[in-house]
Amino acid sequence: MCLQSVIFKLLSSIEAQLHVVHEPEASTSEKDQIGWNETTVVVLSGITNLLANYLDVLSSHTTFGESWKALLAHFKSLLDFKVLDINTAVFKSLRQILSKGNVKGSDTPNFDRSSIDLAWDLWSESLPIVKSDRSDKRFDNQDYLLAYVSALPEIYRLVESDLDDGRVQRMLTLLREAIQQASAAGYTADIEYLTPLQTQVLESIKIIRTDIEGIPAALIGQVAGFTALAFEPRGPPTETQRPTYVALSKASMTLSEKLILDHSSNNNIYMSGAVSASISTLSKPIVLKYSFPTITKGTSPWRQATTSALAILKAILPVITKEELEESVMRSIWSSIVTIANGVTTAFCHHLPETVNIRDDQDFDITSFLTLRELITPALGSQVIPDKTRRAYTESLFHMSLIHQPEPQELPQINQELLATLYQPRKGRTIDPTPSLRSKMSYVCFDELVSLVALHDSSPPRIKLAQAAAPYLILRAGLTLRAYIADQPLRGRMPQPLSQRRELLYILKALVKLRCEPEAIPDTPGIDSEGKKHLHRLYPLLAKAVRAAARDQEVLECVGKALDEVGMEFGL
């Protein structure tokens, strides 16, 4: 057979010459090395075309199995030289030959199980390394890695019927290695568009069948890893050559969304931690928001993450609230959900580029938060969820509800009771703080605190949520009242700044209207109250506010209504 007598002898002679020119102690010039590398690539291309075009004839011969084994052994020997161009040629050859085998409609398969396993072994043994100088800014391994990954769909087509969890895990590991080993040279920054390699990796993942136990979870977990790449800290200066992964991250968010929605009823994706990992990863860009240094022209990563997270939560929350999942799984998922909720309401708006539209982003976040609150309330009050998770949520609502930022000393200090300084007067100020650039969101967060404390159905989850929110609502109202009591007398006949006046009136009206959950706030000694306990706690401040509001009829009227509510509970 000509394979043995001609082709394999030719490959053996080339391998022998490559050993000579790449011997560390050899005095071979770089030009000679490059020449033999190029010769090898040309020979491989010619051999590949011959084998691919005549595969049906060759595979019908009884010795084809041994010849195939020998060919792959030569491929392995060539890979051992760790030469970039040769490695690229080897995997292009493998893909081209495999693409002609076992095609649909063929009467006889070209590759039997043993031959397919040999091809799988060559591809899956490892991602073959190449000799490189990473300090060389011209180094570009994208074509090589693309050739390697492009061989997978053909291998997958042949092994699909015998696919198992182990093989899928190996595929995913090697695909991730290919993504992470890619250099950025030769490509424009992958911010708006995927590189060909990244596209091929995602397309390879999409073809993997998901009807085998454990595979959906494995895919979700791996795609979550791709999402995270853009937000991982960059290494030393030499790593600036690596891709940005921004476009990959956004595409992975969309793929994560689809995978989880398609398999939301699969218990294993929760128990394995895949869902938790996915939503935890989505929380990173949402929390970073404007702090993410890479500017995009298209949809920003935090917006895409928010959209995908909401779609995922809409699908999984009905499942996790009904399924009896392990407490550790539930707690991990809910911790990430709260992180996402807090990230949606938060934004650090200092030193922003001109391309940022704060008002438009705020409207997007408000719509997202209102959607999210409908999904998580009252489920967040479940006894399985730790109190600290609920407190993290309500504490963030408190901080984001602050329209005029107080001085640090006005807030409770570490290891101090939340309401320990509620009644302590502060020094008056004549310099008025600038209102938040996201005041509209601040009012939404305040409204949510009020809603959480309000009486609904007195169910255990509602009580838990009300208890978590009540002290923050009281503190929030107390800060505004204390500021008014301290600052207004210093203004004389000058009116209160419009933004502060609007805030004060809004809060007073909400407090008067609120009928709180009876178990949300501990009873005040000697006072029997049901729905107005929040006003009892604020009574000392309300009484002082009357004196400060002597010249402002509207404020005086609102404070008076609050005091009247307290009086009615005393029978006055």
Go through each PLM region and give its residues.
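Extended amphipathic alpha-helical scaffold segments
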Residues: 1-572
